Structure formats: C-alpha cells, structure tokens
C-alpha cells in the first residue's frame, strides 16, 4: 500500500518546499499539506512543485470549525484551494462547542448545517469532504463529532460528495469501529491516517507515537479498512512535540517508511 506524508509530521523542521522535496527523495508518493504551509509557499507554487514531483495530494488539511463565527468564508476558500491542488479530499475538523455554550447537541446540529451549506459548492468543485472524527478528549475545543458512527450519520443524511477520514489515533478505542468501517465502505472511506497511541500520553494533541511504538493494533484496523474496499494511500500523521518534531526530518521519513512496511 502506498504511503502519504501528512506534513504535520515534520512541520517544525521543514517548510512545504522541503517537504515536497523530501517526499520525492524518500520515494513517498503522496502528500497531505496543511493550508498554512500552502499559504506560506503560495498556492500556485505549491501546486507546481507538487506536480513536478508527481505527488498525489491525498488530502488538504483542513476545513471545518463550523461553530466559529467566520466559518463559511474560510471553508469556501478551503474548497477552492483543495480544487486547485487536485486534493483527493478536504479534511474537516468540524469544531467543538459553540463558544460560551455547553450544549453539545446544538453544536453538533450547527456542524451538520454548516457542512450541508458548503457541500453543494464542494460537489461542484469536485472536492469530496472528509469528516474526521476526533477523540472525545478533543470534543470541547476541536471536534464534537467523535465516532465514525456520528460522522457517517451525517454522511447518510447529506448524500453524495462526503465521507470520512479514518484516523487510527482518534478511533482505535471505539467498540463499534469494525462495524462502522464496514458501514462506510469504499464510497465513504476517503482517507486513512496512521500513527500510534503512546502509553502514557503526555499531551492531548502533540504526543502521537510512531507506528509500532504504541498500543494500536494497526494490522487489524488495516484489515478492516481494506476489507471494506479502501485501496487508497496510508497517510502518516504524527504530532510529536516531545520526540519526532525534534529529530532530523530525513530520519523521520526513513522511519515512517520502515514502520509502515513492518508495523502496519
């Protein structure tokens, strides 16, 4: 299975131009850039450089945050950027609680309505929207869609042009995971993100592990994903303030490739 680099993995060491070059040198065939990195490089130059290296843009990170005040304009720009980069999907980190509110049900309804509002624009642009459920520990601040089941309920309600990004870090614990991956199937599984869950976890956001260093049964989840019809890239996404962000980025990419072959 082909490997893609989510650029968060080396964001503290390299800019986007260096990441694109690094993927080419390490024969990593896919890349999933973050919008701030694209903006820093310039959209046109990023598009040109990615194409010159024959990289597949497996996703653009990110749209979402539908509970924020300025969500609409930013998401419309994100769709446009994803279209220009020919991204296979626009990843949505949907947003946490409405500011000042404790009503998680209301927040989830607002998220559903926001996605419904931008979906016709995304369909017209040919950009699939990928809802990424986040671990419940991030429900308040980042995403109050926390399981594949919740995400797929929205997908089923809204129809075509929308699916899920299955990030093992966020969903490995879910007792319904196998069932919901099967439910998603080839149509809804738009992205598959890999890393590992460390014990102990020292930070709620930035202490992900390299594949093989934690407790996630990656081969098992891979078998479920592939059994459901997914044949796309495996996208490594590691936020690691205390470890991998401090290492030489070429070494990080080398280990990513090695662990993908041996642990996933």
State each model region's role.
Residues 9-11, 35-39, 63-66, 94-98, ...:
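Active-site-proximal loop/turn and secondary-structure-junction residues that shape catalytic pockets
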Residues 22, 26-41, 59-66:
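N-terminal substrate-binding region of glycoside hydrolase catalytic domains
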Residues 32, 59-61, 91, 130, ...:
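Conserved beta-strand positions in the central sheet of alpha/beta enzyme cores
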Residues 32-51, 98-103, 138-139:
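Glycine-rich, proline-tolerant flexible connector loops at the mouths of alpha/beta enzymes
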Residues 49-73:
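Short hydrophobic interaction/assembly module
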Residues 1-27, 53, 80-81, 86-88, ...:
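Histidine-acidic metal/acid-base catalytic patches
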Residues 43-53, 114-124, 180, 220, ...:
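Catalytic-core regions built around general acid/base machinery
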Residues 67-163, 173-174, 248:
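Active-site acidic/histidine proton-transfer and metal-coordination neighborhood
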């Amino acid at each position: 299975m082909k490997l893609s680099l989510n650029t968060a993995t080396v964001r503290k060491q390299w800019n986007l131009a260096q990441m694109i070059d690094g993927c080419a040198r390490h024969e990593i065939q896919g890349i999933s850039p973050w919008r701030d990195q694209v903006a820093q490089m310039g959209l046109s130059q990023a598009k040109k450089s990615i194409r010159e290296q024959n990289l597949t843009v497996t996703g653009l990170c990110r749209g979402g945050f539908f509970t924020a005040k300025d969500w609409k304009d930013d998401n419309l720009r994100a769709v446009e950027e994803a279209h220009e980069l020919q991204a296979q999907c626009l990843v949505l980190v949907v947003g946490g609680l409405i500011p000042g509110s404790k009503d998680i049900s209301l927040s989830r309804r607002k998220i559903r309505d926001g996605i419904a509002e931008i979906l016709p624009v995304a369909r017209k642009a040919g950009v699939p929207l990928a809802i990424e459920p986040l671990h419940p520990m991030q429900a308040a601040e980042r995403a109050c869609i926390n399981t594949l089941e919740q995400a797929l309920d929205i997908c089923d309600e809204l129809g075509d042009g929308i699916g899920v990004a299955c990030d093992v870090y966020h969903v490995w614990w879910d007792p319904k995971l196998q069932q919901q991956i099967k439910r998603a199937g080839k149509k809804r599984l738009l992205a598959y993100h890999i890393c590992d869950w460390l014990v102990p976890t020292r930070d709620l956001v930035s202490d992900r592990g390299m594949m093989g260093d934690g407790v996630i049964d990656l081969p098992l989840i891979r078998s479920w994903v592939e059994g459901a019809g997914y044949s796309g890239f495996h996208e490594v996404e590691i936020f690691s303030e205390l470890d991998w962000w401090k290492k030489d980025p070429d070494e990080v990419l080398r280990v990513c490739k090695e662990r993908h072959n041996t642990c996933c």
